[in-house]
Amino acid sequence: MDNENNKNTKNSQQDSSFSEGGIRELLDRLALRSLIEKEEAAAPPKTYEDFKFWKTQPVPKFDDECTQEGPIDPNTDINQVPREPYRLLKEFEWATIDVTNDNELSEVHELLTENYVEDATAMLRFAYISEFLRWALMPPGYVKEWHVGVRVKSSRKLVAFISAVPLSIRVRDKIIKKCAEVNFLCIHKKLRSKRLTPLLIKEVTRRCHLENVWQAVYTAGVLLPSPVSLSRYMHRSLNWKKLYDIGFAPFPLGSTEKKETAKYHLPPNTQTPGLRPMELKDVPAVQSLLSQYMERFELAHLFSEEEVRHWFLYTDKVSSGPVVWSYVVENPESKKITDFFSFYSLPSTVIGNPKYKDIQAAYLYYYASDSCPKDLSSESQLAFVERCKLIVNDALILAKKFHFDVFNAVTVLDNNLFLKDLKFGEGDGFLNYYIYNYNCPKIPGGIDASKSVDYSRPSGMGFVMI
């Protein structure tokens, strides 16, 4: 279940026109993927002893020093895993959700739309489309039993949901071939006093264990025991006038509407020679390029060709949306794929506004370039950053062309090195990354000790969670 942000009281109008209480704050709230209910986010900071549920789980304590990297609980005996689900209150029952079934997918869609994320003023709410959920929940090798629901026995109404999907990750020099990504924990608003969150987490964990999966990655906007990394949200206005008209982007002091519109102006056409939509034939080249780029990071998602096809093309033969857009740069002479970038769509409904019904939000996803430096020279690093700026600026141009209103990103990959130059502003939202049942040293997430964006070094995070 997504949660409200811990707010940072520092605001900089020099870097962004988003003001405190405005669109930046709201988009930060809508950007989080977490395993904690909304009301927990508003609570004061907790000590480890306050986390009654997480104290029972194989996760690091806050003050643990990693003396040996690896699983916290080394037991991987499937025979010791309970075969029966955890017990629920008598009025509820477990359900395995078949997301290939339109009716059941519609139930998940309705639950998430009405309960998953809503800002504190009830003015913005995620507006999922069914194809987004299929994309997110049905990657290669997905396990049907990992789409876990809770129904009311008497009415059969779906009132809670949690999901996991399979993936492989690398943590420094250790590969976790069988891992899970846990997401979309959602509980009906009227049932959040029923303590369903721990049961949902335990049940999806049990089902993962039955598939011989013992580690999982997940994120939270609040601090839990104990994150492997912390990153920050950044936002770039594409349609400043619309955001202003909605009432979430007031004028910075001394500015004018003309100045703000000009500040975020983008050219009508992309700037990178050889840029074109990704096609099915590009999958092997993109997989190779992405794999090489991921070597740069301490924690990385390891993509197979099948996963590249799913996550960056989905059902397209030529990338065309409406869920994910992917582009490659092809050298016109050698025909080699030299660069790749992608972004996905997750809009929000604007509640109670007579003029606008939604905010169209694009999210920077994965990218890669063969200009990624193989040495530590400042010249190589600078050339790479300039290349990233060029291709991600083209992503902005394309997102503007496709009528997106705002472009969001997190300070993972190398984003922290160049997004400020593309007029992204620092958001107030932060995202903690966790690995269940795994202990390792902390990994930089693109921010410094004061939680400001660190422009001096790349992040160590080669992982983007939708």
Swiss-Prot record:
Tetradecanoyl-CoA binds at F51, K52, F53, W54, L185, C186, I187, S193, K194, R195, L196, T197. It holds the Pfam family NMT. The modification Phosphoserine is found at S17. Its EC number is 2.3.1.97. GO terms for cellular component: cytosol. Gene3D superfamilies: 3.40.630.30. Keywords: Acyltransferase, Cytoplasm, Phosphoprotein, Transferase. The active site is at I466 (proton acceptor). PROSITE patterns: NMT_1, NMT_2. The keyword Acyltransferase applies. Residues 1-21 are annotated as: Disordered. It comes from the Eukaryota. Its main location: cytoplasm. GO terms for biological process: long-chain fatty acid metabolic process; protein localization to membrane. The keyword Cytoplasm applies. It is an enzyme of class 2 (transferase). It is found in: Cytoplasm. Monomer. Adds a myristoyl group to the N-terminal glycine residue of certain cellular proteins. This is Glycylpeptide N-tetradecanoyltransferase. It comes from Schizosaccharomyces pombe (strain 972 / ATCC 24843) (Fission yeast).
